[in-house]
Amino acid sequence: MVSTEDFDYNLPEELIAQTPMIERAASRLLVMDHETGALEDKVFYDIIDELNPGDAVVMNNTRVLPARLYGVKPDTGGHEEVLLLNNTHDDEWEVLMKPAKRAKVGTEVVFGDGQLRAIVTKELEHGGRMIEFKYDGIFMQILEALGEMPLPPYIKEKLDDPEMYQTVYAKEPGSAAAPTAGFHWTEELLQKVQDKGIKLVYLTLHVGLGTFRPVSEDNVEDHKMHSEFYRLTEEAAATLNEVKQNGGRIVATGTTSIRTLETIATKFDGEIKADSGWTEIFIKPGYQWKAVDAFITNFHLPKSTLVMLVASFTGRENILNAYQHAVDERYRFFSFGDAMFVK
């Protein structure tokens, strides 16, 4: 049995980054050799030295929705907070509602001055709800006007500029949380990467809030993964296959890029093909990696599936040792924190 406790570590609260770096690429970078566990302290700008001509850097171009809405129930005047999780079909969404116990099937909630309304259509097992939106106009424009950016619960500070909770290449709206390893990239640094003969490849995975959920079950096998929508285009798949054939490495930016590529490679017997769908892949120790050769990732929450994902590539001892080093050296942790490059 793989125990959840095996992926716990002690993190002083003051190391949880509360604000983004003004200069994105000035964050620190802990470089790790996944076989030996050897560590090097660098700055994210130095990532260019870690990449070779002929490699491909893969990034998730999802855009975070202003997914938190505050509304009123017209029949009682009661307040409801609605957090969008997944757009399952047309105007139907899977959401979390607070207070949930008052959100029965048929409950109506009105947002703003009434330009957006929602009806609860179903109660879900995990406490969530299915709702259907009614509105006049373009949904995304209304959401941009009424919604708030849903920052992770461990970030207590208000964000001055919501764009700092997006990557510089975010363009496909649909996430409830950002693919945070991508925060460190700047347009200037990506240009330098390209100039060095490295391919830039974009895919889409819409990040759900399950990303932040610690594993509550003692036995890792009992944990149920959340489902997330992904897409890889023909063009992106062709570039990645060409890179692989020519001996280059596929370098994933973040766990969302990893999960997309490994989902596809698992589905097609190790091959990378254009594909879209929903993934519940749980990458944990014992998993055989099929597509990704190296990756950039932030420092993740204790006992989270993301620590387990990294451990499946590096070995548990190596990753816990790296995290202890990061704590000792006062690295910044979680969404707005520093990065690792695992090779």
From Swiss-Prot:
Gene3D superfamilies: QueA-like (3.40.1780.10)
Keyword line: Cytoplasm, Queuosine biosynthesis, S-adenosyl-L-methionine, Transferase
Enzyme class: transferase
Main location: cytoplasm
Molecular-function GO term, any one: S-adenosylmethionine:tRNA ribosyltransferase-isomerase activity
InterPro entries xrefs: QueA, QueA_dom1, QueA_dom2, QueA_sf
Localization in the cell: Cytoplasm
EC numbers: 2.4.99.17
Biological pathway: tRNA modification; tRNA-queuosine biosynthesis
Pfam family, one: Queuosine_synth
GO BP field: queuosine biosynthetic process; tRNA wobble guanine modification
GO cellular component, one term: cytoplasm
Highest taxon above the source species: Bacteria
Reactions that this protein is recorded to catalyse: 7-aminomethyl-7-carbaguanosine(34) in tRNA + S-adenosyl-L-methionine = epoxyqueuosine(34) in tRNA + adenine + L-methionine + 2 H(+)
Role this protein plays: Transfers and isomerizes the ribose moiety from AdoMet to the 7-aminomethyl group of 7-deazaguanine (preQ1-tRNA) to give epoxyqueuosine (oQ-tRNA).
Subunit structure: Monomer.
Record-stated family: Belongs to the QueA family.
NCBIfam families on file: PRK00147.1, queA
Protein name per UniProt: S-adenosylmethionine:tRNA ribosyltransferase-isomerase
